[in-house]
Regions:
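Disulfide-stabilized extracellular recognition modules
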Residues: 79-130
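A short alpha-helix/helix-coil micro-patch that ends at or immediately precedes a cysteine
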Residues: 2-45
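Short glycine-/small-residue-rich flexible loop motifs, especially phosphate/cofactor-binding loops
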Residues: 15, 60, 98
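Short, surface-exposed glycine/acidic/tryptophan-bearing loops
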Residues: 30-83, 101-103
Length: 130
């Protein structure tokens, strides 16, 4: 079964990875979590992953719609992992996702997970700066 998302635990995992790699810690931002939830739900509904929403939106637009005045908004998505930790591991091992995790200018994150009808999990991590 898929583990329930614990945003505080997810934040701790992101910060552990960032600080281990010489980057500053970030905070959890409800607006970015809202933007992440929109994308996770959209992906689960469509059973596909990507960075464009079904309405054509990009991560920056979704962050701004949620009230986050983004100078920067990047997004990591994953599907099928049973926990945030598993999704995080896959991002750490993928160069583009790793780069997003370690962007020095990032100050805040938002996280979300939604499941499709088959119980497959769609994870979204939005990383941003205002």
């Amino acid at each position: 079964p898929v583990q329930k998302l614990d945003p505080e635990k997810a934040l701790a995992e992101v910060n552990a990875f960032r600080t281990k790699n010489g980057r500053s810690a970030v905070v959890l931002d409800a607006r970015l979590s809202q933007a992440a939830a929109v994308q996770s739900k959209d992906q689960a509904r469509r059973s596909s992953i990507g960075h464009y929403g079904s309405d054509g939106s990009k991560p920056m637009q979704r962050a701004e719609r949620a009230g986050f005045h983004a100078k920067l908004a990047s997004e990591n998505v994953a599907a099928g992992q049973k926990s945030f930790s598993d999704a995080m591991r896959s991002w750490e091992e993928s160069s583009g996702h790793r780069e997003n995790l370690l962007r020095p200018e990032v100050t805040a994150i938002g996280v979300a997970m939604a499941k499709n009808e088959d119980g497959r999990a769609y994870w979204t991590l939005v990383l941003g700066a205002e």
